[in-house]
Amino acid sequence: MATSKSRFGLVLNGITGNGKTTLVKAMQNFYNICKFKNPLNEEEAVFYTHASITFLTSKELYHLYAQDNKRFDRCMNTFILAIDDLGTEESDFCQYGNRYKPLEELLSYRYERMLPTIVTTNLSGKAIREKYGDRLADRFNEMMQVVTMPDINFRTPQTE
C-alpha cells in the first residue's frame, strides 16, 4: 500500500525522439504478459491477468472528455494509466459557457486516489508549472518520480 511518502507515478521527460514513448510501450507490453498477485489481497494465491496499462495521448484524453465522457471516466479510474506527450493538448475548452481543464481534472483525481500514473512529456518542471499551475505542479512533485531521458534523438542519424 502506498504511503504519503511513496511515489505512485512516473514522469519520463526529455527532448523529442529520445525513447520516452517506446519505453512506456515496452513497459505496457511487459506488464500485459506478466501475472501478478492481487495487490488488494496479498494472501490470495490466485494470480490475476486482467491487469494492464491503459495508454493514451494527452490529446486523445482531451477529446474523450468532450466526446465520450464514459470512456474518459474509465481512464480516470483505470489502475495504471499512461499519458503520452503531456503538454501537447489544449489547456482547456469552453462548453455551454463553462470552462473545463480535462487533464488537470484527470491528474488531480488520480493524485487524490493514489492511482499509478505514467507520463511522457517534453516539458520541464518549470514548463509544467507554467502550463498547469502551482497546484498541479506541486502534486506532480509529490506523486511522480521524474526520469530525465538523455538528450539523444534516436530518430535522426547520429554522427560520430
Segment roles from a protein language model:
Residues G17-K20:
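Conserved glycine(s) of the Walker
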Residues N29-I53:
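Post-Walker A helix-loop "phosphate-sensing" segment adjacent to the P-loop in P-loop NTPases
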Residues Y48-Y111:
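Conserved nucleotide-sensing/catalytic segment adjacent to the nucleotide-binding pocket
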